[in-house]
């Protein structure tokens, strides 16, 4: 009898990259549905534009690099990059913005480094930050939730706003906001920071229509709960590990609680931090990117906690209302250092 000795690894994970990406895309459905419910069909249209751009640009670069196009596109990583960017930008942003951001994310932030598995920074967040720095006005032009919107644009108006900048009746973004008192910026985090800088107290800010008596903001807390539900699905399917989301949310919640207890008249409450902006999207769908996150369990805890601290610092003292994208990229920079000091010790090695 002949015994064959196989080389390591002796255990195999049968899940392919494409299957994991499909699970993530499936988990994103609740967040997309709820975000569309509160903010309109623009969310879906931005996703379609981002997906088409991601596939087209990735295919073009792969052709230039003389690599297999179909096999690479089937891993769905480009599609996920486009989706994460699309749900992060205002639903009525001009069409060319999501195209530009997605192309930059795929070509510069991903393929320039060698493709999937080689990029040190999260591509979607690179694309988002490029757009935010280059076009700050358009990137902060969110309409308030449809619950308090002065007028709800029809699907045809949404199409025209994205592709022409005007509705069929000639209205623009300013006219869609008309009649909503006290809203200069439509997201709760935008409104909170802008109003505090204008000299209003926290109690006065929370009386604005964008909050509607809900500390995390009308619509936004349900959007975050939907992304949380998708994240729990990923944990149940073991598509992601618990270390990064838990440490991120604990760190953000702890910092927000301490800050709020110390200065309740100038800092946001823990509830607002946890259920506003891109908190849950970042915790479960962005920070958990296996390529750009730490690879050890202790490292993941440190990585997530660091990102949570950075989000709180940027939101509370920085120039941008939501610091998730910047926090992710800054935490990505530290990954090699974190992995170096948290790598398992080899048995017998001093």
From Swiss-Prot:
This is Ion-translocating oxidoreductase complex subunit D. The modification FMN phosphoryl threonine is found at residue 187. It comes from the Bacteria. Its EC number is 7.-.-.-. Belongs to the NqrB/RnfD family. Its cofactor is FMN. The complex is composed of six subunits: RnfA, RnfB, RnfC, RnfD, RnfE and RnfG. It is a multi-pass membrane protein.
């Amino acid at each position: 009898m002949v015994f064959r000795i196989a080389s390591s690894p002796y255990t195999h994970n049968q899940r392919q990259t494409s299957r994991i990406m499909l699970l993530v895309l499936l988990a994103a459905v609740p967040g997309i549905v709820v975000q569309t419910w509160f903010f309109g069909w623009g969310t879906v249209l931005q996703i379609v534009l981002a997906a088409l751009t991601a596939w087209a640009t990735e295919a073009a670069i792969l052709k230039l690099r003389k690599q297999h196009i179909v096999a690479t596109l089937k891993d769905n990583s480009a599609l996920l990059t486009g989706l994460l960017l699309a749900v992060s930008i205002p639903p009525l942003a001009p069409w060319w913005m999501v195209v530009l951001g997605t192309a930059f994310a795929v070509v510069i932030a991903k393929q320039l480094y060698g493709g999937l598995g080689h990029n040190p920074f999260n591509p979607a967040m690179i694309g988002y930050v490029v757009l935010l720095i280059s076009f700050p006005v358009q990137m902060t032009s969110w309409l308030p939730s449809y619950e308090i919107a002065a007028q709800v644009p029809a699907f045809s108006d949404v199409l025209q706003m994205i592709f022409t900048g005007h509705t069929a009746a000639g209205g623009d973004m300013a006219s869609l906001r008309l009649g909503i008192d006290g809203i200069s910026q439509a997201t709760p985090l935008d409104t909170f920071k802008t109003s505090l800088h204008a000299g209003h107290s926290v109690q006065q800010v929370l009386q604005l229509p964008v909050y509607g008596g809900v500390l995390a903001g009308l619509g936004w807390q349900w959007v975050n709960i939907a992304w949380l539900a998708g994240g729990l699905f990923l944990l149940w399917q073991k598509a992601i590990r618990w270390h990064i989301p838990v440490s991120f949310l604990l760190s953000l919640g702890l910092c927000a609680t301490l800050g709020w207890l110390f200065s309740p008249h100038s800092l946001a409450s823990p509830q607002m931090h946890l259920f506003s902006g891109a908190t849950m999207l970042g915790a479960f769908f962005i920070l958990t990117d296996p390529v750009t996150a730490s690879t050890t369990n202790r490292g993941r805890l440190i990585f997530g906690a660091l990102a949570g601290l950075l989000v709180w610092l940027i939101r509370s003292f920085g120039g941008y209302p939501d610091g998730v994208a910047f926090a992710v990229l800054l935490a990505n920079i530290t990954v090699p250092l974190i992995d170096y000091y948290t790598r398992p010790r080899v048995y017998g090695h001093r």
